[in-house]
């Protein structure tokens, strides 16, 4: 009887080995089949390349606004004057359509630099810089006006110009995105 028991143990062991091997091959095959599908959900390399840009601020004069492109959108970078900063901070919150303090819209220690997405929050036109009654931006499409801090002051727009995510790499360089 011991020969029969040994054969059963060997057959069981062989069967277990075959099941385990077949299961492993099936799992690897499934992983190989689904990997391209899962990988296609990642952003492409051209999208990743546009996800952030670095801008040198050293050539932007005081009072000047420069437009750069980030993710297909215009970005207004303004080197504000001390008078412009003072007038933006003197505005009462009750006078604003979308109340937001000037200090919140700029980075601490870099109060002269304002970075905004240059798209009107009403219907998506590109406002003109250094225009309008508030020394900021004027949207030629429907007449919205923004002050020197990019806050909407007049017109159909209900929101301020959006401040994109950015950091100062140095005193003269920022990374947007």
UniProtKB/Swiss-Prot annotation:
Key words of the record: 2Fe-2S, Cell membrane, Disulfide bond, Electron transport, Iron, Iron-sulfur, Membrane, Metal-binding, Translocase, Transmembrane, Transmembrane helix, Transport
Chief localization: membrane
InterPro entries from the UniProt entry: Rieske_2Fe-2S (IPR017941), Rieske_2Fe-2S_sf (IPR036922), Rieske_Fe-S_prot (IPR014349), Rieske_Fe-S_prot_C (IPR005805), TAT_signal (IPR006311), TAT_signal_bac_arc (IPR019546), Ubiq_cytC_Rdtase_Fe-S_su_TAT (IPR019470), Ubiquinol_cyt_c_Rdtase_Fe-S-su (IPR006317)
Reaction(s) this enzyme catalyzes, per UniProt: a quinol + 2 Fe(III)-[cytochrome c](out) = a quinone + 2 Fe(II)-[cytochrome c](out) + 2 H(+)(out)
Intrachain S-S bonds: 125-141
Cofactor(s) required, per the database record: [2Fe-2S] cluster
Record-listed [2Fe-2S] cluster binding positions: 120, 122, 139, 142
GO cellular component, one term: plasma membrane
Compartment(s) where it occurs, according to its Swiss-Prot or TrEMBL record: Cell membrane
EC number, as in UniProt: 7.1.1.8
Pfam families reported for this sequence: Rieske, UCR_Fe-S_N
Transmembrane segments: 18-38
Gene3D superfamilies membership: Rieske [2Fe-2S] iron-sulphur domain, Single helix bin
Membrane topology: Single-pass membrane protein
PROSITE patterns from the UniProt entry: RIESKE, TAT
Domain Rieske: 88-175
Cofactor note: Binds 1 [2Fe-2S] cluster per subunit.
Additional observations: The Rieske protein is a high potential 2Fe-2S protein.
Role this protein plays: Component of the ubiquinol-cytochrome c reductase complex (complex III or cytochrome b-c1 complex), which is a respiratory chain that generates an electrochemical potential coupled to ATP synthesis.
Record text on subunit structure and interactions: The main subunits of complex b-c1 are: cytochrome b, cytochrome c1 and the Rieske protein.
Name the record gives this protein: Ubiquinol-cytochrome c reductase iron-sulfur subunit
